[in-house]
């Protein structure tokens, strides 16, 4: 008896089901940020899977979180293993806008965007009215996207991006 061949995902539901949670992606992030451990965030992964854009661009996702418990500064990062060719410039802008809107929705909205270089990588930074910042890095050679949000004077978002592992 033979089994039916596996079909490629064709519908949005099929594609969403094909996005895996892969904690191994967290190895791209530094183990610590300013001395605070980066730990997997199942809540963040669940939120990422609910993003309507993710299934069209990502094959796998992981989320990590680091916090200074004494003062509440934090960084939250989503690492996405991209589908080959799925994130051209326009789609990357859409991703950033969607991520920034979501991150800033509880911080009084997006008030600015900037582009800079950190550790030799182009980084897109969003600023929320409430002080939260977002960071986006596209590692084209690895088909990986990292989007992070951070709050606080310690600038944990910048430190996370600065210390990404090769």
Which residue ranges define each predicted feature?
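A short, solvent-exposed beta-edge/loop patch
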Residues: 36, 109-166
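Short, surface-exposed beta-edge/turn micro-motifs
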Residues: 59-60, 72-76, 133-135, 142-144
């Amino acid at each position: 008896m033979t089994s039916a061949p596996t079909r490629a995902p064709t519908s949005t539901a099929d594609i969403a089901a094909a996005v895996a949670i892969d904690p191994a992606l967290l190895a791209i992030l530094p183990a610590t940020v300013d001395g605070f451990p980066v730990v997997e965030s199942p809540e963040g992964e669940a939120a990422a899977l609910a993003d309507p854009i993710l299934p069209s661009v990502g094959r796998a996702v992981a989320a990590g979180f680091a916090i200074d418990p004494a003062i509440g500064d934090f960084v939250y990062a989503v690492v996405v293993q991209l589908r080959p060719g799925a994130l051209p410039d326009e789609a990357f802008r859409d991703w950033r806008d969607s991520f920034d809107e979501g991150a800033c929705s509880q911080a009084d909205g997006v008030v600015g965007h900037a582009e800079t270089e950190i550790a030799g990588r182009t980084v897109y930074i969003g600023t929320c009215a409430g002080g939260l910042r977002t960071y986006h890095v596209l590692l084209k050679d690895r088909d990986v996207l990292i989007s992070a949000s951070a709050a606080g004077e310690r600038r944990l978002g910048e430190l996370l991006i600065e210390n990404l592992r090769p």
